[in-house]
Amino acid sequence: MSLLAQLDQRIRHHGGLIVSCQPVPGSPLDNPAIVAAMALAAEQAGAVALRIEGLANLQAVRPLVTVPVIGLIKRDLPDSPVRITPWLEDIDALAQGGADIIAIDGTQRQRPASVSALLAEIHQLGKVAMADCSSLDDALECWQLGAEIVGTTLSGYTAEETPDEPDLALVQCLSVAGCRVIAEGRYNTPAQAAEAMRCGAWAVTVGSAITRLEHICGWYNTALKAAVCPANEQ
């Protein structure tokens, strides 16, 4: 049975939650052993797959879990805004590290390696390709180029301002177009994730709301401060 067929079964039985275990850089949680523990806990809690950034984290996670792992490497390049798995060498490293699915930036931006070249390298190594996209045009082009999965990962993150809500409209458009789409980006409540599935998502990736303690505390602190400020002003 193919990896995607196996994932289809997991999604039908468990509901389609993918957990992204990517701590805030520099956080006390930003440690491969802690990332591996989070990943194992997520699997035990019913995650159908995991999204792991960085080779050290991938190598720590892979021996502990049985669910598929989406691997990526983030880089800050001086001559390109593309951050997610920009180099062909990154794909080779992720494949050797045990990633089942390799995620790349699928946007139409200046980059060191073309999307088509990255997809070809992923397939040459026998892995499944996921394209992290920002728009309908991005995703449809990546789908036509052979990406088995397209994600709404970068929707709202390539412009100056990032919206608060997830891009459910993009999920629905991609589903109608026949794409296998993973909803990702600002799915901070179970209700939002469920709505993405109703819009046609194949699965939903949740990161900050599960594995980024600083973000979760920030949401609560903002709400609590807003609640007490009127009382303090009286």
Curated annotation (Swiss-Prot):
UniProt entry keywords in alphabetical sequence: Carbohydrate metabolism, Isomerase
Leader sequence residues: none
Record-annotated membrane-spanning stretches: none
Pfam families for the chain: NanE
Keyword match Mitochondrion: no
Involved pathway(s): Amino-sugar metabolism; N-acetylneuraminate degradation; D-fructose 6-phosphate from N-acetylneuraminate: step 3/5
Family indicated by similarity: Belongs to the NanE family.
Protein name: Putative N-acetylmannosamine-6-phosphate 2-epimerase
PANTHER family listed in its UniProt record: N-ACETYLMANNOSAMINE-6-PHOSPHATE 2-EPIMERASE-RELATED
GO molecular-function term, one example from the UniProt record: N-acylglucosamine-6-phosphate 2-epimerase activity
Recorded catalytic activity of this chain's protein: an N-acyl-D-glucosamine 6-phosphate = an N-acyl-D-mannosamine 6-phosphate
GO biological process: carbohydrate metabolic process; N-acetylmannosamine catabolic process; N-acetylneuraminate catabolic process
Function, in words: Converts N-acetylmannosamine-6-phosphate (ManNAc-6-P) to N-acetylglucosamine-6-phosphate (GlcNAc-6-P).
Keyword Isomerase assigned: yes
Enzyme Commission number(s) from the entry: 5.1.3.9
Organism annotation: Klebsiella pneumoniae subsp. pneumoniae (strain ATCC 700721 / MGH 78578)
InterPro entries: Aldolase_TIM, NanE, RibuloseP-bd_barrel
A cellular component annotation (GO) from this entry: cytosol
